Structure formats: structure tokens, C-alpha cells
Amino acid sequence: MSMAGKNYRNASAKVNRAQEYELAEAIEKVKEITTTKFDATVDVAIKLGVDPRHADQVVRGTVMLPYGTGKTVSVLVVCKENKAEEAREAGADFVGFEDYIEKIQNGWTDVDVIVATPDVMGQLGKVARILGPRGLMPNPKSGTVTMDVAKAVKEVKAGKIEFRVDKAGNIHAPVGKVSFDSANLAGNITSFIKEVVRLKPSAAKGQYLQGITISSTMSPGVKVKKDKFVA
């Protein structure tokens, strides 16, 4: 058995996979069982009682994590020259228009988030098939298609994340690093879950919030009690 497999098995032995823990206890469990030598990302997975095959049950949105993600987020702003300086001053890592569309057509996607102004979306549509599957296509609903590029860049850099339910009814999101103070992790996780609950579709029937699990990179999942998050 590899060392990674052995570590995972040892970590699993410390967690009752059937038990739901209070959030604070679940966070401490994740910290305890994380054995990676790097600062692992903490992820939240939420199981929802929705059928994403129906458009009126698709849950998607954004949330500003109060304590950030702990990750350095690289941002490309696709805009015309009149917005370029504003984007650079706000901290965008890459700024351009047709030159970056050409780079993307040639296979470049080495960026975490793309922000675009509405007047370039027609041209950016040329690379939608490349960006879409990677979750990089700008979207007005997530605030990444806007004339206020400075605000969009600053929010993304500060910890704004985008989420969307998958075909199985699950939502996954990174909410910080294992090195974060436990209270800060709890604040990020609570903000994320509350926003998902707020976005409950009116068409969703039965129990909406069906399960919450937190984990770190390469660690087993730890279940979290749902009662405090159910309206």
C-alpha cells in the first residue's frame, strides 16, 4: 500500500462516517486527519434535493467568503483599451482583447477567472467552446460580465467564489485552507451554506438540504449537522 493510501486509511479510522458532527467539531476533525505536507484546501460538498435536469431547479450563484479562499486567484480582463488601465489598477493579472482571444484559440487557459465587458462578449463567443467546459466563460449572473471591471476584479481577488449544482444534485466549493483559524473556516462555510439555502428554487419539493460534508485535499469527508442551516 502506498503512503498516501495508508494515510487515508489511518485518517478514515478517526472519523465515524455515519455520524454528523457540529460544524466546529467537523472542522477540527478535518484539521486532525489532514496529513498533506502542503497547505491543503478545505472543500464543502452539499447534497441538494433538486433535479437539475429542470431549468427551474438549477441552483447557481456567487458568494463572498468573508475570510477569502487562501488562494492567489489569477484574473484575465477581456476589454477594449478604454477599460484596460482600470483593470490593471484593480489588480488584474492579464488585460487585453483580441490578443487574448487569439491566445485562447491557440489553447491558452492558464487563468482562474475571466472578467469581460459587455461590448466584447460577441467576439469572446468565438472561444465559448473552450472556456465553457472549464468554467471560465464570463456570465452576467456571476458578475463577470460588467463595465465595472475594477469592482469585479477586486471581489474575485478578495474571495468571491462561483458555484453551480452538478447533474447529481451536488454543489462543491473551496472555502479556505487547513491553516486557517477554525473560526474563520466556520465563517466561510456558514456564509456559503446560507447562500445556497437562500437560493432554494420554488420548484424544489421535499427536503432541500440533504447533506453537508467537509473535507480537505486527499482527506475523507466529515459530515456536518444540517439543523442549524435549515430555515
Swiss-Prot record:
State the Gene Ontology BP annotations: regulation of translation; translation
Q: Mind telling me which Gene3D superfamilies this protein's record contains?
A: 3.30.190.20, 3.40.50.790
Q: Which CDD domains does the record associate with it?
A: Ribosomal_L1
Q: Which UniProt keywords apply?
A: Repressor, Ribonucleoprotein, Ribosomal protein, RNA-binding, rRNA-binding, Translation regulation, tRNA-binding
Coiled coil stretches, renumbered? none
Q: Name one GO cellular component term.
A: large ribosomal subunit
Please give the SUPFAM superfamilies that the UniProt record associates with this protein: Ribosomal protein L1
Q: What Gene Ontology molecular-function terms does this entry list? A: rRNA binding; structural constituent of ribosome; tRNA binding
What's this protein's family per the entry?
A: Belongs to the universal ribosomal protein uL1 family.
Subunit info here reads:
Part of the 50S ribosomal subunit.
Instruction: State what this protein does.
Output: Binds directly to 23S rRNA. The L1 stalk is quite mobile in the ribosome, and is involved in E site tRNA release.
The molecule here is called Large ribosomal subunit protein uL1
- What lineage does UniProt assign to this protein's organism? Bacteria, Pseudomonadati, Chlorobiota, Chlorobiia, Chlorobiales
